[in-house]
Regions:
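A Rossmann-like FAD-binding core segment of flavoenzymes
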Residues: 6, 11, 84-175, 230-231
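Flavin (FAD/FMN) cofactor-binding core of flavoprotein oxidoreductases
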Residues: 103, 235-252
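Glycine-rich, N-terminal phosphate-binding loop of Rossmann-like dinucleotide-binding domains
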Residues: 15-16, 64, 144, 156-157, ...
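A conserved FAD-binding loop/helix module that cradles the flavin
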Residues: 195-238, 244
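C-terminal auxiliary extensions adjacent to catalytic cores
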Residues: 253-301
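FAD-site-proximal beta/loop scaffold in flavoenzymes
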Residues: 23, 29-56, 148-151, 155-213
Length: 301
């Protein structure tokens, strides 16, 4: 640790994510020109300044990596909110969504509707694997096309945060931490519990803040039992809710419930539980803000 060694009986890690810019030619070392803005802070401020400086009639191009990545609906929400800003401030402009995936990864029908409502302002292009970028000309080289942008936002491929590899945690595909879902302990490393986006995901389990909060509760309950010499809960249940703004006021959501399956040894989505919004509306916007206040209070109490 920063101020010296700390002894522990059980260790809980939430490594988050780190990026693999080297997998895209020309990107590494150029993220001041081509921001990812996928970690809040200077990068998100940088992207905002670039958008504010973009001329009316300019092109904002965003590239989405292949799943899994942090926050499945996040890139599509960003596209909507950038379009909402440009529609008012720079209506001659264009939002180009270059998706390495074959389709929208979350709330597909709802985001498709949202993009359609923006008309010619938004163009969604699936199966757009990014080969390389030119930071001087802000050009994205796809497998079969070359895209010139005024603002180029490339979200690189991801893996578990650097501490995961440095600590020798077991990684699936050299990227995501393999865990025992009953305790969230890293496989082969008893006493080391890992949470959040860094995990190799169970089926249909998103890398979201809400899910990380749920992981923490499963781990905490398991740790209390283990300290008492008791087995962990054999059937933990976790839930997820994710709200996405499609403009300044209208919001959509997705929710899911996942229960541990003893045979498969991982959480499985509960059929019929959760679901998605019927349509974007302002009432869901109020629910989104209430959700945010509640989860902040829960996590920061």
């Amino acid at each position: 640790a920063k101020h010296g060694a700390i002894a522990w009986d059980r260790l809980v890690l939430s490594p988050g994510i780190d990026f693999l810019p080297g997998r895209i030619g020309g990107l590494e070392g150029n993220q001041e020109r081509i921001p990812h803005a996928w970690k809040a802070g200077p990068q998100t401020v940088l992207l905002r300044k670039q958008l504010e400086a973009m001329p009316d009639g300019g092109v904002f191009a965003m590239h989405i990596p292949r799943a899994p990545y942090r926050c499945p609906p996040g890139p599509y929400e960003r596209a909507c909110l950038v379009a909402n800003y440009l529609r008012d401030a720079k209506p001659k402009s264009k939002v180009l969504v270059l998706d390495a995936n074959g389709e929208i990864q979350s709330k597909k029908a709802l985001f498709t509707q949202a993009f359609e409502r923006y008309g010619a302002l938004v163009e969604y292009v699936p199966n757009s694997a990014l080969q390389s970028v030119d930071a001087d000309t802000l050009t994205a080289e796809l497998e079969f096309d070359s895209i010139k942008a005024d603002v180029l936002n490339v979200i690189p491929p991801m893996r578990a945060g650097n501490i995961a590899a440095a600590a020798g945690l077991p990684l699936i595909n050299d990227a995501w931490v393999d865990v025992d879902w009953l305790t969230l302990e890293a496989k082969g490393m008893p006493g080391v519990h890992v949470l959040g986006d860094a995990l190799f995901p169970a089926p249909a389990m998103p890398k979201s803040g809400h899910m990380a909060n749920q992981h923490a509760k499963v781990a905490a309950a398991a740790i209390l039992n283990l300290f008492e010499g008791l087995p962990p809960n054999p059937t933990p249940v976790v839930m997820n809710t994710c709200y996405s703004f499609v403009d300044a006021k209208n919001v959509i959501h997705v929710a899911s419930v996942h229960q541990f399956d003893a045979e498969k040894k991982q959480p499985i989505p509960v059929s019929g539980a959760g679901g998605v919004s019927s349509m974007a509306n302002e009432l869901e916007g109020k629910s989104a803000l209430a959700w945010a206040r509640n989860i902040w209070a829960d996590m920061l109490a």
